[in-house]
Amino acid sequence: MLRMRVDHVVYAAEQDGARATADRLAAMLGAEAFDGGVHPRFGTRNVIIPLADERYVEVVEVLDHPASDNAPFGQVVRARSEAGGGWLGWVIEVDDLSAQEERLGRQAVAGNRHRPDGVELRWKQLGLKGLQADPQ
């Protein structure tokens, strides 16, 4: 049986940037936001608001970097932020990504994030084209 769970939700930064946006949201949630790091392949950076059970809100903004113009995620974040920011999408973790690749007829793409402490996180993802066509 396929196991899946909500991993996090994504919120595009409002006009005053990811940090200020995340601080406002965190205050409403009774949480404390922290810098998440940079997505070099996407030309974005994020601020994390931790929630219960290892879930979180990711507040993301584009960087002034060519990757944000070329990567679908960077394009989606830029468009949503330029429209005032707000909820962008949600991320589901699955235990068998290959089954989802087969079901959708697409290969997952690599993603990574460099945290401020130097740790690099890596993952594979599907669905950015769908998010681009129909932002949440």
What is each residue range found by the language model?
Residues 2-36:
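Short, extreme N-terminal leader segments that mark the start of a protein/domain
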Residues 2, 4-16, 37, 45-55, 57-58, 66-103, ...:
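Vicinal oxygen chelate
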